[in-house]
A protein has these predicted regions:
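Helix-loop-helix hairpin linking two adjacent transmembrane segments in secondary transporters
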Residues: 1-41
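Short extramembrane helix-to-coil loop segments that connect adjacent transmembrane helices in Major
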Residues: 8-9, 15-18, 99-110, 233-237
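C-terminal membrane-cytosol helix-exit motif in multi-pass small-molecule transporters
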Residues: 30-52, 254-262
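Flexible cytoplasmic inter-helical loops of multi-pass small-molecule transporters
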Residues: 41-63, 269-276
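Extracytoplasmic gate region of multi-pass secondary transporters
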Residues: 71-129, 183-187, 191, 218-226
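A late C-terminal transmembrane helix in Major Facilitator Superfamily
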Residues: 122, 197-234
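Helix-to-loop junctions at the C-terminal end of transmembrane segments
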Residues: 125-141, 230-231
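C-terminal transmembrane helical hairpin of 12-TM major facilitator-type secondary transporters
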Residues: 142-190, 247
Length: 278
């Protein structure tokens, strides 16, 4: 798409009008998502089993927020794990300038190779993480989704630090392929893990809150962190060091609180199981 965009000056679209080639690339990439969204209308509402959030049966936004803050020691470090994933994923928006400044790749070449790597690793890793979570859960490992997420965090840290520092761009891209596996591990189990510790009456609202938190963390921390380190520490040509520092800087604290999150998660899961809820 990027290669094609260089060959035209503008594209005329109904209703929207004339858009620039780089803008039209977003229409092309996003359109398949609209088709996929139609299939969600065919999904049925699953049966509900969990108790409501409050004794009085409250299930509005304020009940959800009260529940979250009343259980902040569970939810906040739990969500932090998945915020880390988006911070790193969004910071990799600097991948094109990283490869251009460090190894001389043009953005179009980076985009093509990166797309191949993502297609080769992402779908398999997401589905494998889901399968592994189900398998471990069926064997009685109640904190299986969080364990898999923390494994993903460890993979992200190691590969995220190593990839920008290697001397060869193809080796770097291969390591970023492994990094994609880590990101997929964390991403795949987030909502599953959350729903296991959430009452019925606020599930949808808490999932929305979860997505809001991880999206804002990714947008407001990931790219700005790279930019700040470039501007004030490593300089424009030192982008590889910024890209290597951010995964470690934000990832190590997440791993350190991992055992605590696992313990609190098991306690919450056991609480719901004690209520006889599946």
């Amino acid at each position: 798409v990027l290669q094609w965009a260089k060959t035209v000056e503008g594209v005329d679209l109904p209703v929207v009008g004339t858009v620039k080639p780089w803008q039209f690339t977003f229409f092309i990439v996003g359109f398949p998502g609209l088709i996929l969204a139609l299939f969600f209308f065919l999904l049925r509402e699953p049966p509900r089993h969990r108790p409501t959030v409050a004794p009085e049966g409250g299930d509005n936004l304020w009940d959800m927020l009260r529940h979250v803050f009343a259980n902040a020691s569970l939810y906040l470090p739990f969500i932090a794990i998945f915020c880390y994933m988006t911070i790193i994923a969004y910071s990799q928006g600097f991948g094109a300038p990283l490869f251009q400044r460090t190894w001389g790749w043009e953005p179009a070449k980076y985009a093509t190779v990166n797309a191949i790597v993502l297609l080769a690793t992402g779908p398999f890793a997401v589905n494998f993480a889901g399968w592994l979570s189900d398998r471990w859960t069926s064997r009685g490992i109640s904190d299986a989704p969080v364990r898999i997420a923390l494994i993903g965090v460890a993979i992200i840290i190691v590969t995220g630090v190593a990839a920008p520092l290697v001397p060869n761009p193809y080796l770097a891209m291969a390591i970023y392929g492994a990094n994609t596996v880590g990101i997929a591990f964390v991403s795949a189990v987030g909502v599953t893990a959350l729903l296991n510790i959430t009452p019925d009456g606020i599930k949808a609202q808490l999932v929305a809150f979860y997505y809001m938190c991880i999206s804002m963390a990714g947008l407001f921390i990931g790219p700005p962190a790279i930019g700040l380190f470039n501007d004030f520490v490593f300089g424009t040509d030192g982008i590889r060091y910024s890209m290597a520092l951010v995964p470690a800087l934000f990832g190590v604290p997440v791993l350190l609180v991992g055992p605590y999150v696992l313990r609190r998660y098991r306690e919450a899961n056991a609480h719901y199981e004690s209520l006889g809820q599946g």
